[in-house]
Amino acid sequence: MDGFHWTDIVSSMPPSIPPVEIIEQPKQRGMRFRYKCEGRSAGSIPGERSTDTSKTHPTIKINNYQGPARIRISLVTKDSPHKPHPHELVGKDCKDGYYEAELSPDRSIHSFQNLGIQCVKKREVEDAVAHRIRTNNNPFNVSPEELKADYDLNTVCLCFQVFIPDQAAGRMLPLPFVVSQPIYDNRAPNTAELKICRVNKNSGSCLGGDEIFLLCDKVQKEDIEVIFGLGNWEARGIFSQADVHRQVAIVFRTPAFQDTKIRQSVKVQMQLRRPSDKEVSEPMEFQYLPDEGDPHHIDEKRKRTLDNFKHYVKNNPFAGGETRPQRRIAVANRNVPTKSEPIRPSIPVPNPVVSCLPFSMPVLKAENVTSPSTLLSTVNISDFSNLGFSSQPPSQSDHDRLESMLNYPSFPGDANLDLVEMLPHENESRCTSLSSIDNSDFSQLLSESQSSGTLSAALQEPGTSQGTFMAYPESIARLMTNRPNEDEGGERIDSGLINGMFDISREEIHLTSLFELDFSSLLSNMK
């Protein structure tokens, strides 16, 4: 049978030969051609009406005939003259790139399953075509010169050749062969099935200009367009090749609708179309909306008032509640009970600073002191009578002047108070009349107190039963002498000052607390 020339047989066929009809065309798109090196099945060619739930395959019908028959199916090019294609059919009953089998005599309709397409590489095209000629797989007897032309490796057609027995001639009579519609490789972008997968929105203004993001299967940026159509009206989406992203996404702007004065929304069809072969995708619905005339809602914004805004904020479920009160920081307050006794002036006490004195005085207890260098338990005010101190407190004007100048607290009049209670308090008055004190005397006093021998000599003088604590400088003695008299209504400062400072007979006092005062700060404030 391979030695027959089909053109001679077809030309000599009688007019009563039954025709062959393709009643189920192969599906044009959706199938992928497989290379032989992939090592897997090439699949099965589906029918045109095949779905996921109902599978169909290419089907033919031999009209006006029912009986034994033989069929050969091969691959040819889509353009006329149909040349043998270098690709091969693979599957059951396939050899040398074509399918051949006996048909059942009990029926006239025949369906073909398990037919796959196996593609060849470009460098193997010439060898594959030469093999078709050697195996007499050239249904249209194309000349060798025409076989050297280029081949479209992404498109093939099925050629059905049916043979029935001729009882008179004793041979197989070929029936007129038929060629199916093209089958495209789904892997190639220029022949693949067009499909819109998703869009970011499916409505826009009738004036056009809305930006749409469209996701699709692989397309070629130079061979694709987006079509909007309704009846006889058609318009293309506006985009350039740069707006096609990696062959799977297109960003375009919608065209204006044919009637920009519509008062109701209009639904149109949106499709992908390939200009090279006029292939289109399944349509997707797009809705044109009437023009509102105010795209930025300026008129609506002008109508908004402050009351409307407050009402909106109040009813908004995401609106915040009442304004939070200002956050307050808790600060610890030291509540010191104030004394009801009248406030008496005292010596200024500076703010505590780091002392630079090179010595540290020991803590002495009055009841355990037996050596001559210990402190006296009490100091009588009569000891200071020889110094010429006045018993009168300073006048109110002098007291106010001292308080405004030094801002140091005074000691209360209680002679038994501790030195801790003599620290500055908020409501205590200040002693501020030390302007006559010579700063050099304080410096001398500070230098003299640094030696323990001098301190011991100052604590007690030999030959006296009640000595003074130390020899006061001349300027301090002069200040004490110039105090107002007690007859003027003032209070005595000597008793509260001296006894409050040196009364250590009743409780334990640290001697070092007096010398740790920062005299440098005091001197700098009085300058």
From Swiss-Prot:
Motif (Nuclear localization signal): 301-304
Name of the gene this protein is made from: rela
Subcellular location: Nucleus; Cytoplasm
Keyword Signal included in the entry's annotation: no
Molecular functions (GO terms): DNA binding; DNA-binding transcription factor activity, RNA polymerase II-specific; RNA polymerase II cis-regulatory region sequence-specific DNA binding
GO BP terms in the entry: canonical NF-kappaB signal transduction; cellular response to hydrogen peroxide; cellular response to lipopolysaccharide; cellular response to tumor necrosis factor; inflammatory response; innate immune response; negative regulation of apoptotic process; non-canonical NF-kappaB signal transduction
Residues bearing the modification Phosphoserine: S276
Keywords: Activator, Cytoplasm, DNA-binding, Nucleus, Phosphoprotein, Transcription, Transcription regulation
Tissue-level expression: Predominantly in the animal hemisphere of the oocyte; all tissues of early embryo.
Region (Transcriptional activation domain 2): 494-527
Domain notes: The transcriptional activation domain 1/TA1 and the transcriptional activation domain 2/TA2 have direct transcriptional activation properties. The 9aaTAD motif found within the transcriptional activation domain 2 is a conserved motif present in a large number of transcription factors that is required for their transcriptional transactivation activity.
Described function: NF-kappa-B is a pleiotropic transcription factor present in almost all cell types and is the endpoint of a series of signal transduction events that are initiated by a vast array of stimuli related to many biological processes such as inflammation, immunity, differentiation, cell growth, tumorigenesis and apoptosis. NF-kappa-B is a homo- or heterodimeric complex formed by the Rel-like domain-containing proteins.
Protein name: Putative transcription factor p65 homolog
Annotated RHD domain residues: 18-306
Native species: Xenopus laevis
Residue numbers spanned by region Transcriptional activation domain 1: 381-444
Motif 9aaTAD: where in chain: 513-521
SUPFAM superfamilies assigned to the protein according to its UniProt record, in alphabetical order: E set domains, p53-like transcription factors
One cellular component (GO) term of this entry: NF-kappaB p50/p65 complex
InterPro entries to which the protein is assigned, alphabetical: Ig-like_fold, Ig_E-set, IPT_dom, IPT_NFkappaB, NFkB/Dor, p53-like_TF_DNA-bd_sf, RelA_RHD_N, RHD_CS
